[in-house]
Amino acid sequence: ATFMIQNVLPAVLTANIQGMSIEDMKAGLETFIPSATQTPGRLNLFKFKNFTVLLDYAHNPAGMRALKKFTDSMEATVKVGIIAGIGDRRVEDNNELGSIAAEMFDEIIIRQDKRLRGKTEQELIKMLDDGIKMHDPTKKTTIIPSEKEAITFAVKNAIEGSLIILCSDVIPEALDLVQKFKEMESKGELIFED
């Protein structure tokens, strides 16, 4: 993705300024494989048997637009977004985040339990919901304040071929939960009992 190239260019420039050889920079770039281990929260893709989860730290309009550009080419029967607002940003920024989400996703789950940054959970949820409704007043939207419960709900209700795009600002917890579900599936365990 273009924005990944934009992210690596400053690292290459810094390495060059610090006197690193071109061969060492080349070796570093060739052995760098984006993954949940090396880049937690940056386009971490988890392919389950019947659906896919993409975990990313997109948390502002620019990040969300870059994520949209990346996911627009991904095939899915339905795209479900799990989003949260940002308390130290303007109302307009949170509205825009909601509006971009309404463009990106067939269904949206708003969660808002951590890192409120000066606003209340209800204020942030309303800002996102207002932004969603500005773009599409009929967009299917579910409010589940707990990130853990929102992820669990999305995975439990995933239909075949769906893509769940999880925009998280608490990467370790979200990553642990998704990896736990993936591990359960790979062991043949039911993720959820009916």
Predicted regions located by residue number:
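ATP-dependent carboxylate-amine ligase
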Residues: 1, 10-194
